[in-house]
Amino acid sequence: MGSIEVRNPLLSKKLKRTETRLLIIYDNQIRYNQIRDLLTSSDHQVHATLLDDLQNFEKQLHLPWDVVIFGRAYDLKYEQALTLIRNSNQVNLPLILLKPDEYQSTQYASFIRKGVYDILDLEEADNFYLGLLRALSLSRLLQSQQQLMN
């Protein structure tokens, strides 16, 4: 019998060829660098912006983004970020929450119901990367759908 190669379309080169636009909300430059390095080491073209406050987040929402990654911020909570996204022209922009220190797995459903796309742990690099690719694929699909409707 012949063998069948099964390939996950999330890992295709098409996602890597287009620029990935990340808005990273974190008060730590090291985490920002980790995320960028993880993607660039997998041959992604990355345009990322790091910020940690409400005012800059509001300004940046006027620009096109693929995914928001939320860690910790000076004066911004993830709930505020979700509300601002819903009220922007990018209502379907996925927000990934970096696993909070006090996070319990029993809270997962509550975060998802509030509008968080997923909760990922940057310390688990492979899982983080695959979760980010899922969010990126959804974002690109929704962007294409929106362009067709306009």
Residue spans for each PLM region:
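Non-catalytic signal-transmission and effector/linker regions of two-component phosphorelay proteins
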Residues: M1-T40, R140-N150
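Residues at the ends of beta-strands that form strand-to-helix hinge/output surfaces
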Residues: L120-D121
